[in-house]
Amino acid sequence: MTNLRKTHPLMKIINHSFIDLPAPSNISAWWNFGSLLGACLIIQILTGFFLAMHYTSDTLTAFSSVAHICRDVNYGWLLRNLHANGASMFFMCLFLHVGRGIYYGSYLYKETWNIGVILLLTVMATAFVGYVLPWGQMSFWGATVITNLLSAIPYIGTTLAEWIWGGFAVDKATLTRFFAFHFILPFIITALAIVHLLFLHETGSNNPSGINPNSDKIPFHPYYTIKDALGLTLLFLTLLLLALFSPDSLGDPDNFSPANPLNTPPHIKPGWYFLFAYAILRSIPNKLGGVLALLASILILLIIPLLHTANQRSMMFRPISQTLFWILTANLITLTWIGGQPVEQPFIIIGQLASMLYFLLILVLMPLAGLFENYMLKPKW
């Protein structure tokens, strides 16, 4: 009798994707983040589903419903802490996954890469609307500041902002629709993730050397299922340590105060995972210019495949590009730090220089480094 996993219509798809999938024999732990992101998504959907059973999306009761979840619901405090810190773990894995893609040239699988960028934008949108739901001070003012950026769009800006708000300011209608968005978007993310995998399995995985691995492949199970299991264990352990011992360390103290439209916090800032983009937004004094820079900071990822000039795919054997990559990483950490600081000197100038360096590295220096490395590899005799 033929093995059921190879003949059953549904099992066959799972088999080709996770069991008999030919995978390069040399992929490192940097290739673990795909499965970790899948695990993060499942955790967020499950914890979010149970939280939604007790949450009320009304401006009068939203804040107290979150307090009720933490105090009165069985293990509600754990659900809330896992969900809030799960978002941080999700973004940490996302940033490392994107970084891996840039370092090893995975962006040359253009369809997979472009779907990945759309996924990143969708996850960011989901996290933003989710941050508003507890209806604390930072939730309300974060929503006000970020949605107000839409009004910078010429002609239609104000109308668009009011359309998103469902009124003339962030209020009950805004909270209700943000809850609806926050509930539906994870399912859209799941669908996009399946498409992402579909495109990846058309080409097969890249590997650290950047060389075609077809001559040396091994089955995904048991080799990489065991490897993924180790990664998942470390992810769950980190998440549990964070959620149980330091659940509020990545949040904002202002969010423990209920939203008050009459009292502006001294320093409005989003979640830590948005701070690099927020710093780029603030580094330009003009409102529309800032919004365009904010969009460009993420959408620039879409043109990275077009900026690849090197003859080698991976940065593994390209020391100049490696150096620039780690400067870019340090620069993004600097931007994240600046985004959390008040708008005063010397933070303003540091933010402006770091923002300029971010675009300079991606658009000019890294493509030039690729060309220079090609020249250095040419025989000179």
Swiss-Prot record:
Can you tell which superkingdom this protein's organism belongs to?
Answer: Eukaryota
- Provide the binding site for a ubiquinone: 201
Q: What does this protein do?
A: Component of the ubiquinol-cytochrome c reductase complex (complex III or cytochrome b-c1 complex) that is part of the mitochondrial respiratory chain. The b-c1 complex mediates electron transfer from ubiquinol to cytochrome c. Contributes to the generation of a proton gradient across the mitochondrial membrane that is then used for ATP synthesis.
Listed binding positions for heme b b566 are 97, 196
UniProt subunit comment: The cytochrome bc1 complex contains 11 subunits: 3 respiratory subunits (MT-CYB, CYC1 and UQCRFS1), 2 core proteins (UQCRC1 and UQCRC2) and 6 low-molecular weight proteins (UQCRH/QCR6, UQCRB/QCR7, UQCRQ/QCR8, UQCR10/QCR9, UQCR11/QCR10 and a cleavage product of UQCRFS1). This cytochrome bc1 complex then forms a dimer.
Further notes on this entry? Heme 1 (or BL or b562) is low-potential and absorbs at about 562 nm, and heme 2 (or BH or b566) is high-potential and absorbs at about 566 nm.
Q: Which UniProt keywords apply?
A: Electron transport, Heme, Iron, Membrane, Metal-binding, Mitochondrion, Mitochondrion inner membrane, Respiratory chain, Transmembrane, Transmembrane helix, Transport, Ubiquinone
Q: Does Transport count among this protein's keywords?
A: yes
Gene Ontology cellular-component annotations: mitochondrial inner membrane; respiratory chain complex III
Q: Name one GO molecular function term.
A: metal ion binding
Membrane topology classification: Multi-pass membrane protein
Concerning Gene3D superfamilies, the annotation shows: Cytochrome Bc1 Complex, Chain C
TM stretches of this protein:
33-53, 77-98, 113-133, 178-198, 226-246, 288-308, 320-340, 347-367
Gene designation per UniProt: MT-CYB
Summarize where heme b b562 binds, as residue positions: 83, 182
Which cofactors does this protein require? heme b
Question: What name does this protein carry?
Answer: Cytochrome b
